[in-house]
Amino acid sequence: MAAITSWITDSGCKDHASLVSIAKLAEQAERYEDMAVAMKTIAEMGNELNNEERNLLSVAYKNVVGARRSSWRIMSSIAKKQAGTPLADQTDIYLKKVEEELTKICNDVLALLSKNLITEKIGAEAKIFYYKMMGDYYRYLAEVQEGEQNDKSTEAAEEAYQKATSLAEAELSVTHPIRLGLALNFSVFYYEIKNMPEKACSLAKAAFDAAITEVDSIKDETYKDSTLIMQLLRDNLTLWSSECETDS
């Protein structure tokens, strides 16, 4: 059974331009499942995605999985409060259903990345984007897993983030929004998943400090994105400061 269902699958549409148009319309209508299926269909056709299309794919799945992540957090909190009560079993069943949905979506994205999107022919920027995305979705799996499964997803996330980081440091400027977004998410991974606040702070601070020295050279078309991510890095450093020994 597919992780996400949509009328687009039944329509049999395989025209690249039409699917991109559908994805854009779906985004405006906040129908993110349709948006995700449209972009997945393009990727599975073997077409290399341009920058706009990569962002459409990312936004679609971020919203689809984001709804489940939010539901899982709420249900997990309720389950803890209701432990030992008559509603405990029902709550646990519901929590597992949400967890299954989230897991299927993450595995769907990870399969798409490894089988269709990360190829030898794509450029460095696309490769960094996809490895970052791979790290993100393994991180989302690790959030809801325990034991050996959690260990495997955590290791896979770190490996993907590290591949993206090595490429980004060689290929992208310190103010590039993809490089900054990668540093933001990698630092969150260390803070939330690996419980390594000092490592998280060190990574976030290095990225912020490097970018702030080059802030005047940011291109107009990326200025808004880059400065927004820099602010998020700074916000996290402020939030985490009590647990860090770095000079922030």
Swiss-Prot record:
Recorded superkingdom: Eukaryota
Lineage: Eukaryota, Metazoa, Spiralia, Lophotrochozoa, Platyhelminthes
InterPro entries: 14-3-3 (IPR000308), 14-3-3_CS (IPR023409), 14-3-3_dom_sf (IPR036815), 14-3-3_domain (IPR023410)
Family: Belongs to the 14-3-3 family.
Signal peptide as annotated in the record: none
Name of the protein in question: 14-3-3 protein homolog 2
